[in-house]
UniProtKB/Swiss-Prot annotation:
The chain crosses the membrane at residues 11-31, 63-83. It is a multi-pass membrane protein. Its main location: membrane. It is found in: Cell membrane. GO terms for cellular component: plasma membrane. Keywords: Cell membrane, Membrane, Transmembrane, Transmembrane helix. This is Uncharacterized protein MJ0792.
Length: 89
């Protein structure tokens, strides 16, 4: 079991942590996009408003979870936001 001695679990844990933070960041963005779709293309303002409210709630929840993880959560969140803005630019 030499792969256990090389810290594979630490690397795997870091990848999982970044993925979790990425999911917390992506959820409010997707809900906001759904709200924009309902507002501009469908014309359903009530559904759009519900999407915006849920997006805001999930963003606050994601920020609280990231803060609870401490420096690792903050670093993962910053990395995810910078990476996603670089890819989408």
């Amino acid at each position: 079991m030499k792969f256990l001695e090389k810290g594979v679990y630490k690397i795997f844990g870091a990848v999982i942590l970044v993925s979790m933070i990425g999911a917390l960041v992506a959820e409010p963005i997707a809900l906001g996009d759904a709200g924009l779709y309902y507002q501009y293309y469908v014309g359903d303002i009530d559904t759009a408003q519900q999407c915006y409210l849920v997006a805001a709630d999930s963003a606050i929840t994601g920020a609280a979870i990231s803060a609870a993880l401490g420096p690792a959560g903050l670093a993962s969140g910053v990395f995810t936001v910078v990476f996603s803005t670089t890819v989408l630019a």
